[in-house]
């Protein structure tokens, strides 16, 4: 029983340490990656190409990805630069 509790504790600890992020992929210029006129699997393929687990086209407008590595830039409302001049 003690080993089982130890195993579960380690499992949750690893889950907290290896935390990935979810969010919208960004295009050049800081805008969300559009999927309006793309094929149905476009977002899943793009997310996988960026080493994410999966993705989908949110409301047929932008690619949303799950479990993205920390090095991938994702769109953030607070730092949004889409359509703004430098």
From Swiss-Prot:
One of its GO terms (cellular component) is extracellular region. Disulfide bonds join 31-82, 35-57, 43-63, 47-65. It is found in: Secreted. The modification Cysteine amide is found at residue 82. GO terms for biological process: defense response. Residues 21-83 form the LCN-type CS-alpha/beta domain. SUPFAM superfamilies: Scorpion toxin-like. Its main location: secreted. It holds the Pfam family Toxin_3. GO terms for molecular function: sodium channel inhibitor activity; toxin activity. Expressed by the venom gland. Keywords: Amidation, Disulfide bond, Ion channel impairing toxin, Neurotoxin, Secreted, Signal, Toxin, Voltage-gated sodium channel impairing toxin. Residues 1-20 form the signal peptide. Has the structural arrangement of an alpha-helix connected to antiparallel beta-sheets by disulfide bonds (CS-alpha/beta). Belongs to the long (4 C-C) scorpion toxin superfamily. Sodium channel inhibitor family. Beta subfamily. Beta toxins bind voltage-independently at site-4 of sodium channels (Nav) and shift the voltage of activation toward more negative potentials thereby affecting sodium channel activation and promoting spontaneous and repetitive firing. This toxin shows moderate inhibition of Nav1.1/SCN1A, Nav1.2/SCN2A, and Nav1.4/SCN4A, and promotes a left voltage shift on these channels. It exhibits similar potency on Nav1.2/SCN2A and Nav1.4/SCN4A (40-50% peak current inhibition at 0.5 uM), and weaker inhibition on Nav1.2 (20-30% peak current inhibition at 0.5 uM). This is Beta-toxin To4. It comes from Tityus obscurus. The lineage of its organism: Eukaryota, Metazoa, Ecdysozoa, Arthropoda, Chelicerata.
């Amino acid at each position: 029983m003690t080993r089982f509790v130890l195993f579960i504790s380690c499992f949750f600890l690893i889950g907290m340490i290896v935390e990935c992020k979810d969010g919208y992929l960004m295009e050049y210029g800081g805008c969300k990656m559009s999927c309006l006129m793309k094929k149905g699997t476009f977002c899943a393929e793009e997310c996988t190409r960026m080493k994410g687990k999966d993705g989908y086209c949110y409301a047929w407008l932008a690619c949303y990805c799950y479990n993205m590595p920390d090095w991938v830039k994702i769109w953030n409302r607070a730092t949004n630069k889409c359509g703004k001049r430098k």
